[in-house]
Amino acid sequence: MRRARYIFVGALFLVLMVLVHGGAELQASLDPPGPPAEGTVAALQAWLTSGLPAVAHTAAYYRVIFSIWATIFLLTPALCFHIFSRSTAANTYWRAFWTAAYLAFLVHIYWAVSRVCGGDVHVVFNSKVATAAFPECLIEHPRPDFLLAAWWGLDVVLAWLITDNIKWLRAERGAVHMLAFAMFFGAFVLATKAGIVAHLLGILMAILVLGCVLIRLIVQENDPKSLIAILYVGFFQFLNLFVRWDKLPTLLGVSNLAALREVLRSKNLHNTSDIAVTEEKGLRPTVPYDPRYLCEREDDGQYNDLSKPTMGNAALNPDDPFNGPEFTQSNPGARFGRNIPLSEVDPTRDGDILDPSPRLVSNRLLARRKTSDGGDDFKPAGILNLLAAAWIQFQTHDWFNHGTPRPIDDDPFDVPIPPGDSWPGKMLVRRTRPDPTRKPNDHAGPTTYANAETHWWDASQIYGDSPQAGAKYRTWKDGKLAVDPNTRLIPLDPTGVEVTGLTSNWWLGLSLLHNLFTLEHNAICDHLIKAFPEWRDDPQKTPLEKDAQIFRVARMVNNSLMAKIHTVDWTPAILTHPALQVAMNANWWGLAGEHVKKYLGRISTSEAISGIPGSVANQTGADYCLTEEFTAVYRLHPLLPNDIAVRHFQGDRPGRTLKFEANDLNDPDLIVGPNAMTNALRDASLIDLIYTFGVHNPGAVTLQNFPNWMRRMRRRTGTKLEEMIDLAAIDILRDRERGVPRYNRFRKLFHKPPVRSFEEMTSDPELAKTLREVYGHPDKVDLMVGMYAEEPPEGFGFSDTAFRVFILMASRRLKSDRFYTDDYTPAVYTQAGIDWIDNNNMTTVLLRHFPELTPILQRTPNAFAPWKVS
């Protein structure tokens, strides 16, 4: 087949050369001296010569003209095929046409120099040469022509000698093609003496080539190694030296974000799974392959990536049937990765790990200030409601969990207590649970930590990480999860906590969302049974097999719906900048838009045009996992308020105030820990609680807005209370312990300039003064503190520095997961399941289970924005 393509193009070249020679002779014979002829032939002759220079129209002259026409005739398909050269067939045609066009160009140069310009070699080096025969030599500016010919010839030789996809060769080839296009476009379209035929050929070339570029952008995934991509990224890197992306017009800002994501994908994904295992007894075994893994998620995350079964899986506690967070086995696929080079992972790079004291930072820069009446000064985030705060914890419980820390007597951190602090006794902080696959004295690479949850976006906070966990919450009938038929609530275990996948750090907000999406799972089951009644009625299957089929698909649909809600509802609510509204919808639907995706399906393999779901999975050079830096930027505890004043749905009446802390754990107003939902429902309905969360604001993610009740918590294990903790101080300490760089170093590693002063870090002079007193130098400021101090872009609920990590990892969670890419198909989800995901969002989920909210949610464009009561 390849030989046939070469023969075809070679034959076309020979035919064109015959036509050039014969046509020139014929045209010269029809162009005698004297008055112009009349008739059809004369009209054709006049059209062909229209706009050409008034010189002697000999056969040699016409060979020059016709040979350059033949060159552009062959060059146009060469340029078009080059755009699609990742295809084997297109690459073959490109090589053939590129070579043929070059040979035609050499013929043109031969006739131009040897015949028209009298064989004067000076024409190669001079901008204009005239001869006695041709006072106006056609080659007015030959130097670029010959430079192009030399470069083009070199590339033709390379095209036949080197077939490997080498980076420098791709860049060189892209450059010479762009030069050829620019020069031929200039000579054929912009030159005043080119003639009407040349103008038409140049315009046709431009239309076809630019059309192919457009088609390429639409139908194929972007190649970040292409010259166009390199220039695209380089343009925005240069532009950002003068103006930040969020200051650009919307579409230009979206393009800037896409360029920034390419930079981050190429420079900010670093494997820890390659670090050798040195503790064999801590290595978790890989389960054998089963064909069912092709179309269903495993509880522990194995076999999501079929080529690397352990990629992104959870660490394991083989002694706990529910795979609890006190894991004792793991493998490299469960490790947290890094968004910074491994050589940068050093807990002591920026000084002593306890300097300055995390407690001092907590007291002076994080704690909510006291008001005149002795309360805590709460700074609200006016763009969000409290559901948004609950939602992000609901999601992070799915994503990451470093496990139960080491025991309090196992070499804890002894945090210095500032003078005059009221903290009772010593502040001892447990260390992070170590990676079981590495010995404590292993210095072959940076310290690594394992994830007690799967790294995949798989709704493990509801469905758990083990089959035994599923046995707790499933009904084993019609694929449904257990709910009380009278209250529609998840049943409680003996401790008063809902029976669901993950219940650590439990409070009312988590309870509401676990209950809501348990109801949603069951609604999806009903939808599937209606669409496929044979699933329930199939006599060839046992009741458990019928249940398993419905459960599997309902879980996949519910899981993907939550991912969609996070992408197109939650993120645009907390990032209201116009560019983000476009970009986040494009992540899911593509720039072609929701309606095109719904009614025409994917019109492109490109994630930019048709969205990530259904595109081709890509690990972008590093095994998929979540990262320590991703964990660090999701420290959003200021979102939580001091307390929650219930508002009753009917009449928006005030109710009692629910508390996050109490001296008595049996306090009926306490909504943290066991019985959180039971306490809240004492004199309120479920819809009252949903309504309350919809109308109240969470806290702003800024300095001096960390809830004080979280700075004097008692660590809870089940119903057992242990040591008192300051969560703000622990947040600071955890980043240092895990080698997350401090603020300025972090900015540099994420391609942002470091701040030079505390006044540049914050516009508040009092905060700048406090920062100076606590840290002394901007380079010592902790990442979390710097992000909270930073003035965010317009409409942002958090800093641009944190957003850098989100740009990279938000799309990676989708793009690396085959169940959102290659296997996001009706074969896995069913068409009814895909339609359910397409046609629903957070608003429709709420209305399905609480239709009374219709008047309010119809007035509210985003369910995570403050609800418009009237």
List where the protein language model places each region.
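N-terminal accessory/cap region of cofactor-dependent oxidoreductases and related radical enzymes
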Residues: 226-527, 532, 537-541, 552-729, ...
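Short linear, low-complexity motifs centered on an aromatic residue
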Residues: 756-774
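Acidic, glycine-enriched active-site microenvironments
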Residues: 546
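Long, well-ordered mid-to-C-terminal structural blocks that present hydrophobic/aromatic surfaces
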Residues: 93-96, 103-105, 109-110, 722-760
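Membrane-embedded alpha-helical bundles that constitute the cytochrome b-like, heme-associated redox core
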Residues: 2-228
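Catalytic cores of extracellular degradative/oxidative enzymes
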Residues: 549
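Intrinsically disordered, low-complexity acidic Ser/Thr-rich regulatory segments
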Residues: 52-56, 494, 543
